[in-house]
């Protein structure tokens, strides 16, 4: 079987390649897809299902449409709704949607929009919401932007958990604490490199990382 990542959905010959793989009797899967590509090319979810894939995985990027525009992501609610319809039509087990919380400028209203929209998706087909705290990556357009903070991210996740109760939606969050560690390392320098060694030497727990990174901040 073959497997690709999100960039695979940008390949101009993807549909033809998937058809060739499926027609030859092989299995195929793509770890995640751009939602707009799935919406605009309905053969993609059909062929992936024929290739034995049972989870249709797409990226939503941010909690609200306004935020997706601000971080220049082309995904719209219409694209995501089309993905849910495709997951239902081709009998996928679940639609998995990756998205971020804690994007700079995000408000409580944006989280409410995410709750209501996820419930709309879940009314069409079961949803697994993979939620990761926003961490600015070096050498990307969002490099240098701040981390929302552990307490803010945890409150966002708690609201999502509460708001999705009773819906066909499972919340699969990434730890706010470990996202903070990732942020410090992504935006750090040599002092953070030394902190990695100290954290590992002192057991590697979050408390060890927090202490080690706290020391590096004081240097």
Residue ranges and their predicted role:
Residues 88, 103, 111-219:
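Auxiliary Fe-S-binding modules of radical SAM enzymes
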Residues 1-128:
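Conserved SAM/AdoMet-binding glycine-rich loop
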